[in-house]
């Protein structure tokens, strides 16, 4: 599974500005989804890879980013 890492309190994606390989995104993806996860910056959001199937990713149901 893959997807954008999401802030559970705001419903927002984690923003990033350095596209491609991005240490911040990799660190955040691993922190939220476990050390097996990968991550990089795609379309100015942190995109996480190698997630478990039940991983919660953006968008959150009934929670819009504002």
UniProtKB/Swiss-Prot annotation:
Domain LCN-type CS-alpha/beta: 1-66
One CC-aspect GO term: extracellular space
SUPFAM superfamilies: Scorpion toxin-like
Activity regulation as described: Inhibited by human antibodies scFvs 10FG2 and LR.
Record keywords: Calcium channel impairing toxin, Disulfide bond, Ion channel impairing toxin, Neurotoxin, Secreted, Toxin, Voltage-gated calcium channel impairing toxin
An annotated GO BP: defense response
Bridged cysteine pairs (disulfide): 12-65, 16-41, 25-46, 29-48
UniProt GO molecular function: calcium channel regulator activity; sodium channel inhibitor activity; toxin activity
Gene3D superfamilies, A to Z: Knottin, scorpion toxin-like
Tissues and organs where the protein is expressed, per its UniProt entry: Expressed by the venom gland.
Location(s), subcellular: Secreted
Principal cellular location given in the protein's record: secreted
InterPro entries associated with the record: LCN-type_CS_alpha_beta_dom (IPR044062), Scorpion_toxin-like (IPR003614), Scorpion_toxin-like_sf (IPR036574), Scorpion_toxinL (IPR018218)
Comment field on protein domains: Has the structural arrangement of an alpha-helix connected to antiparallel beta-sheets by disulfide bonds (CS-alpha/beta).
Job description of the protein: Beta toxins bind voltage-independently at site-4 of sodium channels (Nav) and reduces peak current and shifts the voltage of activation toward more negative potentials thereby affecting sodium channel activation and promoting spontaneous and repetitive firing. Has an inhibitory effect on voltage-gated sodium channel hNav1.6/SCN8A, affecting both the activation and inactivation processes. This toxin is active against mammals and lethal to mice.
Family statement: Belongs to the long (4 C-C) scorpion toxin superfamily. Sodium channel inhibitor family. Beta subfamily.
Protein name as it appears in the record: Beta-toxin Cb1
Lineage per the UniProt record: Eukaryota, Metazoa, Ecdysozoa, Arthropoda, Chelicerata
């Amino acid at each position: 599974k893959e997807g954008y890492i999401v802030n559970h309190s705001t419903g927002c994606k984690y923003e990033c500005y350095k596209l491609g390989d991005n240490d911040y995104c990799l660190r955040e993806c691993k922190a939220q989804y476990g050390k097996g996860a990968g991550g990089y910056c795609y379309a100015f959001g942190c995109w996480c890879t190698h997630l478990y199937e039940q991983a919660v990713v953006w968008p959150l149901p009934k929670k819009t980013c504002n």
